[in-house]
Amino acid sequence: MMAKVSKRMKEISAKINAEKKYPVSEAFDLLREVSSVKFVESVDVSVALGVDPRKSDQVVRGASVLPNGTGKTVRVAVFAKGPAADAAKEAGAEVVGMEDLADEVKKGNMDFDVVIASPDSMRVVGQLGQILGPKGLMPNPKVGTVTMDVAKAVRDAKAGQVRYRVDKAGIIHTTIGKVNFTSDALKQNLEQLLTDLKKAKPAVSKGIYLKKVSVSSTMGPGINVDFSDLNI
């Protein structure tokens, strides 16, 4: 098994120059070339930002609605009542409730990928922080998951919204689709993400903000991207 792995790694290393910045379409073509798994891998992106995440006013977080989606089916739970609950159901939310939904969460019944909450439901949701927080599911106004317009938030989540938060090294990690997307679709998704990241630039951030962009498939190596010709 090790021999197989090392042989594959050698083949990949021969195809990818770690020092080179590849044009976007070429980078996506390379991802497909070096993919050797049986499932359809996600295309992940890492963006190194010129921020100091140790400082609270330089923590970059937010959400981006990718024009071509992520290729994933997203199940949405919404904490809301009255007309807001009705609107959430109409928008396609799988689960809608208040205390009853909180009880299900406490029991560990969490068959959903995104949690959205209306502001008046936060008294209920607030009790679930220790359960939802570690799973990255806690609603937050900064990424649009605590909102008066729960129906729009549901539609955005279903349409392929990705959420991001800068890590301790100043890097954003998220997904922009699947390897079976066309290169154009992946490029458009990447452009949207980088555009939204630029809008989220902290006022105190100095120097180069978008420092480095690399893409990879789920099981593949990172490929540096030349993003200078992107429409951002």
From Swiss-Prot:
GO MF entries: rRNA binding; structural constituent of ribosome; tRNA binding
Chain ranges passing through the membrane: none
InterPro entries tied to this protein: Ribosom_uL1_bac-type, Ribosomal_uL1, Ribosomal_uL1-like, Ribosomal_uL1/biogenesis, Ribosomal_uL1_3-a/b-sand, Ribosomal_uL1_CS
Biological-process GO terms, alphabetical: regulation of translation; translation
Keywords: Repressor, Ribonucleoprotein, Ribosomal protein, RNA-binding, rRNA-binding, Translation regulation, tRNA-binding
Pfam families: Ribosomal_L1 (PF00687)
PROSITE patterns: RIBOSOMAL_L1
Domain of life from the UniProt record: Bacteria
GO cellular component, one term: cytosolic large ribosomal subunit
Subunit structure and binding partners: Part of the 50S ribosomal subunit.
Stated role: Binds directly to 23S rRNA. The L1 stalk is quite mobile in the ribosome, and is involved in E site tRNA release.
Homology family: Belongs to the universal ribosomal protein uL1 family.
HAMAP family: Ribosomal_uL1_B
Protein name: Large ribosomal subunit protein uL1
The gene coding this protein: rplA
